[in-house]
Structure formats: C-alpha cells, structure tokens
Amino acid sequence: MGLSDQEWQHVLTIWGKVESDLAGHGHEILMRLFHDLPETLDRFERFKGLTTPDQMKASEELKKHGVTVLTQLGKILKLKGKHEAELKPLAQTHATKHKIPVKYLEFISEVIIKVIAEKHSADFGADSQAAMKKALELFRNDMASKYKEFGFQG
C-alpha cells in the first residue's frame, strides 16, 4: 500500500503549508477533534478541564501539544514510508503509556484532512487529499502493527 513518488510529492507539498503555521494547524486540529469526538478528550488527562471551545482556544498547553503532534507527524511523513525507526518509539508510548486506540488515530487523521482542506482549499484538491489519506492510512497501519508488537490490541 505504498505511495507513488507523485503521491508523496502531493503529501509533502501540502505539508509544507501546514508547517508554515504548526501552532495554528495543530491547535485547530486538536480543538476540532475534542469538539467533534468528545470521548477522545478522555485520553488526555491534562486537557480534561477544557470543556468549552473558549477554554480550548485559550489553552497554550493545547496549542503546544498540537505543535508536538504535527512536528512528529511531519517527521514521519517526510520519511516517505521508511519510518520504522521514527515510528517505533512513538508507537511504544502510544501503546504502553497513553493507550491510544488505533481508531483514535483514524479520528485525528480525518480531522487533519478536514482542517487542511479548509485552510488550504486551493492547494488541497482531490489528488492531494487522496494522497494524504493514503499516507495517513499507511501511518495508522504501521502504528497498529507496532502496537501488536508491544502487546496492545488498541
């Protein structure tokens, strides 16, 4: 299920636009995730007190975590599927410490695509969206495989 060179080019081109404002994109993605799927907030002990959109919007901690999430995802995407070394420690913490189910990775993937489409509609057409979907699916599948190695069936 690898991506073609052209698909990776689509992914990395749009990711360059995301990187131009990691804080804004990351904050928006997490706010949208927690708003649209409130059960995901239960996995984040430090954010449980953020119950309103205004609280989420004002949270520097949430913004900072959004940068962390997108920075890590960007590193993985730039490896174009050759991400074993980068993915393993991420999968280990998500499986053994945070216990984040794979379905939550699906949820955030959908939100990432929605937010990029809203913020960069002119640059994120059908081909780019399909390529990003495929890249995020590759990431999720590889995370799920690693989860099993760590004994987490999430």
Curated annotation (Swiss-Prot):
Binding site residues for nitrite: H65
Protein residues bound to heme b: H94
Enzyme Commission number(s): 1.7.-.-, 1.11.1.-
Binding site for O2: H65
Keywords: Cytoplasm, Heme, Iron, Metal-binding, Muscle protein, Oxidoreductase, Oxygen transport, Transport
Molecular function as annotated in GO: heme binding; metal ion binding; nitrite reductase activity; oxygen binding; oxygen carrier activity; peroxidase activity
Gene Ontology process terms (BP): removal of superoxide radicals
Localization of this protein: Cytoplasm, Sarcoplasm
Catalytic activity as recorded in UniProt: Fe(III)-heme b-[protein] + nitric oxide + H2O = Fe(II)-heme b-[protein] + nitrite + 2 H(+); H2O2 + AH2 = A + 2 H2O
Xref: InterPro entries: Globin, Globin-like_sf, Myoglobin
GO cellular component terms, A-Z: extracellular exosome; sarcoplasm
Residue ranges constituting the Globin domain according to the UniProt record: 2-148
Family that this chain belongs to: Belongs to the globin family.
Function: Monomeric heme protein which primary function is to store oxygen and facilitate its diffusion within muscle tissues. Reversibly binds oxygen through a pentacoordinated heme iron and enables its timely and efficient release as needed during periods of heightened demand. Depending on the oxidative conditions of tissues and cells, and in addition to its ability to bind oxygen, it also has a nitrite reductase activity whereby it regulates the production of bioactive nitric oxide.
Subunit note: Monomeric.
Full protein name: Myoglobin
Phylogenetic lineage: Eukaryota, Metazoa, Chordata, Craniata, Vertebrata
Gene: MB
